[in-house]
């Protein structure tokens, strides 16, 4: 049994853990990173963001090819299965893992591949797969253990046709019909992927409309696009029982309806990976979903233990987790941090087409009684979109009628998650630098998707009187 002491120990090597570890070593700290699996990267790299987005990219390219008259008129349609595309996506995972492993090696982080659990305030055990154990100690700790799909106890996830958003990546059979329970971000993204592969999709939503945190217009656009592509959305429904049968799954809904399909993807919530950490030994409590409460500097109730990423809940974004880790590292080393997450964090939803937003929605601005105006552009009117055959989509800019300050930007369409950053950069400018007039006073490359900003700005400014 090995006993080692470090300035700081980071538990987890996903985006939050990586940001924390890199921030600490840059401050000259001796750092250990404990990862429960044999490869770094966390759920983001191996089961979440990277594989699902690689899948989505492949499916969207197949759709693009099949809808292009140059190819479809010649009966050259591509028909690829979920498992075939997933095998191709695995190459991206290996590239990401190798790159991130290099970060830790070059920065001289000491790596441990095992299960971490607190013994007391300054000691932690690392249990390895072979049953052996090391005891490590540190002055400070950063918990970045991430989250996993919430699996209710009354659903039999051992059944061969019932999956969660992690195990769906092990899908080997080719379903013709899938039920997705939960119409949040993950559910909607997988609905797009399966429908893009011509699989029938029943999307069961426990709420009254899709992705209620979005601007209503974006939510409605996604709902219409799903409907137009044959996805059946069942709003305001909850399961009574989920029954696995020999040839598939039957979902018995509380409304009395029944839905049957070849398989089911349960995608209704996530829970923090805290149950095996021994947090009771250091006096840290979690909520019903295993999440840890922190202050503005990401300190837990135990002042030398910090937590970042999905394990603390909102916003549960890989991009935010990395920044949280970096900020926590700075607070840990200096005692405080002047750096905070930006107020308006962009969200990217990788449905087909994408959705991305930053800032306020129309609903929020109306409730706040802020006098705003709207500028819109339709992708179908942009030369670049016409050239690329990506006519579905729109950009909406919300701005203050009097000051012209940009208050929110909402985009639906191909490359939305990239396009949003142009507007975000202007929104983050101080004082008079944040103005919608920037887009009419600046010359953009032509033809580009960035032209959407100029069109939307002119549209909005023309509404003023």
Curated annotation (Swiss-Prot):
FAD binds at residues 35-44. It is an enzyme of class 1 (oxidoreductase). Its cofactor is FAD. It catalyses: NAD(+) + NADPH = NADH + NADP(+). GO terms for biological process: 2-oxoglutarate metabolic process; NADP metabolic process. One of its GO terms (cellular component) is cytosol. Its EC number is 1.6.1.1. Keywords: Cytoplasm, FAD, Flavoprotein, NAD, NADP, Oxidoreductase. GO terms for molecular function: dihydrolipoyl dehydrogenase (NADH) activity; flavin adenine dinucleotide binding; NAD(P)+ transhydrogenase (Si-specific) activity. It is found in: Cytoplasm. Binds 1 FAD per subunit. It comes from the Bacteria. The keyword NAD applies. Conversion of NADPH, generated by peripheral catabolic pathways, to NADH, which can enter the respiratory chain for energy generation. Belongs to the class-I pyridine nucleotide-disulfide oxidoreductase family. HAMAP family: SthA. This is Soluble pyridine nucleotide transhydrogenase. It comes from Proteus mirabilis (strain HI4320). The lineage of its organism: Bacteria, Pseudomonadati, Pseudomonadota, Gammaproteobacteria, Enterobacterales.
């Amino acid at each position: 049994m090995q006993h080692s002491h470090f300035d700081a120990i980071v538990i987890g090597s996903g985006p939050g853990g990586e940001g924390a570890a890199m921030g600490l070593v840059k401050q000259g700290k001796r750092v250990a990173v404990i990862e429960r699996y044999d490869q770094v990267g966390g759920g983001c790299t191996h089961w979440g963001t990277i594989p699902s987005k690689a899948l989505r990219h492949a499916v969207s390219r197949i759709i693009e090819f099949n809808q292009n008259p140059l190819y479809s008129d010649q009966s050259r349609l591509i028909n690829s299965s979920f498992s075939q595309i997933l095998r191709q996506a695995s190459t991206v995972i290996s590239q990401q893992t190798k790159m991130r492993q290099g970060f830790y090696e070059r920065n001289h982080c000491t790596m441990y591949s095992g299960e971490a659990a607190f013994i007391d305030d300054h000691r932690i055990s690392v249990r390895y797969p072979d049953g052996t154990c090391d005891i490590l100690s540190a002055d400070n700790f950063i918990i970045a253990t991430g989250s996993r799909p919430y699996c209710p106890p009354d659903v039999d996830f051992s059944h061969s046709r019932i999956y969660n958003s992690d195990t769906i990546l092990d899908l080997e059979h080719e379903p013709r019909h899938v039920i997705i329970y939960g119409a949040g971000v993950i559910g909607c993204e997988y609905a797009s992927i399966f429908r893009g592969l011509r699989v029938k999709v029943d999307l069961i939503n426990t709420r009254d409309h899709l992705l209620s945190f979005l601007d209503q217009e974006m939510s409605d656009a996604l709902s219409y696009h799903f409907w137009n592509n044959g996805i059946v959305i069942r709003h305001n429904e909850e399961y009574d029982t989920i029954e696995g049968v020999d040839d598939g799954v039957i979902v018995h809904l509380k409304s009395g309806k029944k839905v049957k399909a070849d398989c089911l993807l349960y995608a209704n919530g996530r829970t923090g990976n805290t149950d095996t950490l021994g947090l009771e030994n250091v006096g840290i409590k979690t909520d019903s979903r295993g999440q840890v409460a922190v202050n503005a500097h990401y300190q837990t109730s135990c002042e030398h233990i910090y937590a970042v990423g999905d394990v603390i809940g909102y916003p549960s974004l890989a991009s935010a987790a990395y920044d949280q880790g970096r900020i926590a590292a700075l607070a840990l080393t200096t005692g405080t941090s002047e750096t905070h997450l930006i107020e308006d964090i962009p969200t990217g939803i990788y449905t087909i087409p994408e959705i991305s937003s930053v800032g306020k929605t129309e609903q929020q601005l109306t409730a706040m009684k802020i006098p705003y105006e709207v500028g819109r552009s339709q992708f179908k009117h942009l030369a670049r979109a016409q050239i690329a055959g990506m006519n579905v989509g729109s950009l909406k800019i919300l701005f203050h009628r009097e000051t012209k300050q940009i208050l929110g930007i909402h985009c639906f369409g191909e490359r939305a998650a990239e396009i949003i950053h142009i507007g975000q950069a202007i929104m983050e400018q101080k004082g008079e630098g944040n103005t919608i007039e920037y887009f009419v006073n600046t010359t953009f490359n032509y033809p580009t998707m960035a032209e959407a900003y100029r069109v939307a700005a002119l549209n909005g400014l023309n509404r003023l009187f």
